[in-house]
C-alpha cells in the first residue's frame, strides 16, 4: 500500500541546514494500523506530512497504491490527496460552521449535489456515533466529539489511507479510549489503512499492528507491536516500552545481581519469564519444582494487555542444587515462553 524509499528531508535556512529525516525505508501494508513513535523532534511529524506531500521530501520516493506521489504535478497531487485523509491534534474544525457543515465541506468543494451531501454526512455521523449532533457547533462539543467530527470529515471522500497526527494527544483518557476504539472499527469495517504518529506508547500498544520507532531522523527499530514490546532492541525503544509495561527490573533487585553464577557460593539465577496467549496456561513454574528439585520463587509478576493479547511477565529466583537449577534453565529455554536471565543472587539477598 505505502512504500517509502530512501527518504530524506532537510530544512535549509540561510547558511544552515537541519536533516530531520535520514534515509527512511519502510513499507506499510494495506488495511493495517501502523504506528510511528518517537520523542519530540525525532522527525515523526515530518515523515507523516511527507506522506501527503504537505512537506516536500529533499530526496527519495513515496509510493501509495502503486503510484509515485513524489513525481506528481500540482494538479495530479490535488486529485490524489482525496485518497489520503488526515486528522490532527487540535481538530481544525471551523467554528463558524456547525457539525453538518464541517463534515460537508470537502464534499461541497468537490461540487457534490446537495442531496448526496446530506445523505453522506448523515451516514458519517452514524458511523462516528454522533447522529444527534448535526446542528451543534464545535464550541458545544467535548474534545472527543470534536475529534469524531474531524474523523467524519476526513472520511467524506472515501480515502484509502487515514493519517493521524497526534490525534489523541489533546484528549482526556476516556475520550482517547473512545477515539482509539473508533479507529479500530473503521480499520476493520472499511478496510482503512491508518498511519498513526504519536509520542504515547500506550496508543501504539492498544491498536497498532506494527510500529516503527524513530530517533534523530532514523528508524531505530521496526516490527510487529507484540514483538517490539516483548523484545525491544534499541535503547530508545526500551525507554518507551518500560513506561508502558513493567519489564524493567526493579532497582532494589538489579543492584543485588551478579553476572557470574559461580562468583559466590549458593548463588542462583534470577530470570524473567514472559507468557502470552495459550502459553500462559502452561504450569511451568510448578514443573520446575516437580522435575528438577528446584524452587522458583516469584519476586514480581504482572499481567499486561498488548493489542488484545494477554501477556504475563514474572521475575523469579530459581534456587536449589546447582545441577537442578542448571537443568531448570535448560528446560525453560526449550519451552514456548520468553526466557531472560537477569543475573544471579544468593537466596538470602533477594
Curated annotation (Swiss-Prot):
InterPro entries: AAA+_ATPase, ABC_transporter-like_ATP-bd, ABC_transporter-like_CS, ACT-like_dom_sf, MetN_ABC, MetN_ABC_transporter-like, NIL_domain, P-loop_NTPase. Pfam families: ABC_tran, NIL. It is a peripheral membrane protein. Its main location: membrane. Coiled coil: none annotated. Keywords: Amino-acid transport, ATP-binding, Cell inner membrane, Cell membrane, Membrane, Nucleotide-binding, Translocase, Transport. Part of the ABC transporter complex MetNIQ involved in methionine import. Responsible for energy coupling to the transport system. This is Methionine import ATP-binding protein MetN. It comes from Francisella tularensis subsp. tularensis (strain FSC 198).
Amino acid at each position: 500500500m505505502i512504500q517509502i524509499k530512501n527518504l530524506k528531508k532537510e530544512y535549509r535556512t540561510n547558511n544552515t541546514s537541519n536533516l530531520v529525516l535520514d534515509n527512511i525505508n519502510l513499507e506499510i501494508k494495506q488495511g493495517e494500523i501502523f504506528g510511528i513513535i518517537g520523542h519530540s523532534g525525532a522527525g515523526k511529524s515530518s515523515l507523516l506530512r511527507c506522506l501527503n506531500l504537505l512537506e516536500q521530501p529533499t530526496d527519495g520516493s513515496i509510493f501509495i497504491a502503486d503510484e509515485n506521489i513524489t513525481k506528481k504535478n500540482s494538479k495530479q497531487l490535488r486529485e490524489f490527496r482525496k485518497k489520503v485523509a488526515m486528522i490532527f491534534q487540535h481538530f481544525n474544525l471551523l467554528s463558524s460552521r456547525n457539525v453538518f457543515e464541517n463534515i460537508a465541506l470537502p464534499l461541497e468543494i468537490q461540487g457534490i449535489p446537495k442531496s448526496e451531501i446530506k445523505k453522506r454526512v448523515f451516514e458519517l455521523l452514524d458511523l462516528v456515533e454522533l447522529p444527534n449532533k448535526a446542528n451543534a457547533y464545535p464550541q458545544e462539543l467535548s474534545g472527543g466529539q470534536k475529534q469524531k467530527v474531524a474523523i467524519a470529515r476526513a472520511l467524506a471522500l472515501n480515502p484509502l489511507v487515514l493519517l493521524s497526527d497526534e490525534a489523541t494527544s489533546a484528549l482526556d483518557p476516556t475520550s482517547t479510549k473512545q477515539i482509539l476504539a473508533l479507529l479500530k472499527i473503521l480499520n476493520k469495517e472499511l478496510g482503512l489503512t491508518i498511519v498513526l504518529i504519536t509520542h504515547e506508547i500506550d496508543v501504539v500498544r492498544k491498536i497498532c499492528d506494527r510500529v516503527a520507532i524513530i530517533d534523530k531522523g532514523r528508524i531505530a527499530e521496526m516490527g510487529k507491536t507484540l514483538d517490539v514490546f516483548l523484545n525491544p532492541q534499541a535503547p530508545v525503544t526500551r525507554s518507551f516500552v518500560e513506561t508502558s509495561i513493567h519489564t524493567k527490573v526493579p532497582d532494589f533487585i538489579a543492584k543485588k545481581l551478579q553476572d557470574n553464577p559461580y562468583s559466590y557460593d549458593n548463588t542462583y539465577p534470577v530470570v524473567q519469564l514472559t507468557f502470552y496467549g495459550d502459553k500462559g496456561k502452561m504450569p511451568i513454574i510448578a514443573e520446575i519444582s516437580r522435575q528438577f528439585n528446584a524452587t522458583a520463587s516469584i519476586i514480581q509478576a504482572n499481567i499486561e494487555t498488548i493489542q488484545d493479547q494477554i501477556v504475563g511477565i514474572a521475575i523469579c529466583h530459581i534456587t536449589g542444587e546447582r545441577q537442578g537449577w542448571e537443568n531448570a534453565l535448560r528446560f525453560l529455554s526449550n519451552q514456548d515462553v520468553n526466557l531472560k536471565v537477569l543475573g544471579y543472587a544468593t537466596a538470602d539477598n533477594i
